[in-house]
Amino acid sequence: AGMLQAHPGGRITTAALAQQVGVSEAALYRHFPSKAKMLDGLIEYAEQTLFDRIGQIMQEQDSAEPRCHHIVLLLLTFVERNPGFARLFAGDALQGETERLRNRVCQLLDRIETQLRQILREHRAQQAALPDYQVNPTANLMLALAEGRIQQFVRSNFRQLPTNGWPEQWALIEQSVFTEPVN
């Protein structure tokens, strides 16, 4: 993941990866049958890390607003702390790689959106007095906002942090989705 951060827009070769880790290419291939499997391992690590923490958020938070907020903030903070993963999530690091890897990242992000959708669906069922919104577009908006912040982070060569301005942006979502209308 560090190499993905250090070489924005560039492809990572197995030779460069072997040199970075301090082993031979042959040693890498003894553990991973292909470069695609190496990238797949990174995606699997990200998925496991994110969904373990999402499970904790679901247990620790008892209402929809903090659950959604913490899940989206988790994604932004994860890529901010691990910029190489931002390139994976933005698709930048997967240019020229197999379609299966791109689909794997899409599946990971889709799972996050599905989690947001489920939280919002339960929230709508419990809170009839809240502003009327459609669950699917709202969950999609939350994830699209996070993906846009990740893309800006990659495009700025990791200078424009995804969490900069996040409290103000979330306040807009919170106001339109979770705040009871004033009569």
Language model regions located:
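Helix-turn-helix DNA-binding elements, focusing on the entry/boundary residues of the two helices
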Residues: 3, 14, 25
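Alpha-helical structural segments
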Residues: 2, 6, 19-20, 37-60, ...
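Short hydrophobic/aromatic patch on the recognition helix
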Residues: 22-32
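Hydrophobic/aromatic-rich alpha-helical bundle segments in the mid-to-C-terminal region
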Residues: 86-91, 102, 106, 124-173, ...
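Conserved amphipathic alpha-helical interaction elements at protein-protein interfaces in regulatory
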Residues: 2, 6, 34, 56, ...
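Helix-turn-helix/winged-helix DNA-binding modules
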Residues: 9-10, 30, 59, 130
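Helix-loop "lid/cap" segments that line or gate small-molecule binding pockets
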Residues: 73-80, 88-95, 172-177
